[in-house]
């Protein structure tokens, strides 16, 4: 049995095909979805989504949004997302370094929050391609 997974951003369709299983980051933790899952709507946190297709796992960096699950259909609406195969390691590492520097230099609550979110997004890109953020010092 399979699931129909669609991942949509405001600009494009990022994924639209059958999968065997997914694991997504929600605001309350990781959630696995298999065929015949109970119907629900949930917020999707910034994090890595794992996708099992033909017995192999791939990943996608999700930048927050919402997921609607209805038995064998999953629609995920995201602010942005990148498939692991589309992420440039050097660009992701540079983004991570810049985000860390911005967090260190942030002044005031708003700047700290914005810098922290930027760092979380940058870390998610690296995690999606299995690169350790600590390798990006």
UniProtKB/Swiss-Prot annotation:
- Gene behind this chain? atpE
**Name of this chain's protein:** ATP synthase epsilon chain, chloroplastic
Q: Which GO terms describe its molecular function?
A: ATP binding; proton-transporting ATP synthase activity, rotational mechanism
**Gene3D superfamilies named in the record:** 6.10.140.480, F0F1 ATP synthase delta/epsilon subunit, N-terminal
Domain of life where this protein originates: Eukaryota
Name the PANTHER family for this protein.
ATP SYNTHASE DELTA/EPSILON CHAIN, ATP SYNTHASE EPSILON CHAIN, CHLOROPLASTIC
Question: Where does it live in the cell?
Answer: Plastid, Chloroplast thylakoid membrane
Gene Ontology CC annotation, any one: proton-transporting ATP synthase complex
Organism listed in the record: Pinus koraiensis (Korean pine)
């Amino acid at each position: 049995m399979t699931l129909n997974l669609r991942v949509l951003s405001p600009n494009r369709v990022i994924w639209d095909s059958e999968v065997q299983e997914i694991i997504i980051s929600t605001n309350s933790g990781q959630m696995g979805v298999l065929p015949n899952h109970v119907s629900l709507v949930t917020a999707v946190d910034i994090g890595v989504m794992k996708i099992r297709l033909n017995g192999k796992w791939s990943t996608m960096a999700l930048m927050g949004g919402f997921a609607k699950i209805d038995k064998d259909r999953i629609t995920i609406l995201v602010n942005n997302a990148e498939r692991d195969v589309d992420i440039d390691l050097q660009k992701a590492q540079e983004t991570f370094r810049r985000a860390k520097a911005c967090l260190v230099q942030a002044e005031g609550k708003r700047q700290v929050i914005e810098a922290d979110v930027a760092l979380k997004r940058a870390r998610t890109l690296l995690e999606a391609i299995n690169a350790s953020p600590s390798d990006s010092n």
